[in-house]
Regions:
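A short alpha->loop->secondary-structure connector
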Residues: 126-130
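Catalytic nucleophile serine of serine hydrolases
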Residues: 114-116
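Extended, subdomain-level signal for the structured scaffold at the beginning of enzyme domains
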Residues: 1-110, 119-125
């Protein structure tokens, strides 16, 4: 059985806030292998609302592997830090909010760094509304 890590991508995100999460999970998997432990595969998905690439604050282009319309499991969803004011990204990526709510209802776990926490906060605030 695989561990499913989903990395949400946004324009103007801090690239290291996403790539570091992927590297940490791959490192943990490598350490398990080196220690001769039973190793759970790590499946990492890079997701955007439409499956298209994003441009990070450092000018890197990151290609998504999936869109929100695709069907896949997530054990952990990682939300990146955004460059400067997160409000424009929250508006531009509004489609993430209902999707995050749905994942929360499926008992998915979340991590977020820096300004990425605002997406979780907005999604959870919306859970309390009818």
């Amino acid at each position: 059985m695989a561990f499913n890590l989903t990395l949400l991508l946004c324009d103007n995100m801090l690239v290291s806030s996403t790539t570091l999460a992927a590297e940490i999970f791959y490192f943990a998997q490598a350490m398990d292998r080196a220690s001769n432990h039973e190793v759970q595969d790590v499946v990492i998905r890079r997701v955007t609302p439409d499956g298209k690439s994003v441009h990070t604050s450092a000018g890197f282009e990151l290609q998504a592997t999936h869109s929100l319309a695709d069907s896949f499991d997530s054990d952990l969803i990682h939300i990146p830090a955004l460059w400067r004011n997160p409000r424009p990204a929250v508006s531009k990526y509004e489609a993430y909010i209902p999707w995050l709510r749905e994942q929360h209802q499926r008992n998915c776990n979340f991590t977020a760094v820096g300004t990425g926490v605002c997406k979780i906060a907005i999604a959870l605030i919306l859970l309390a509304q009818p």
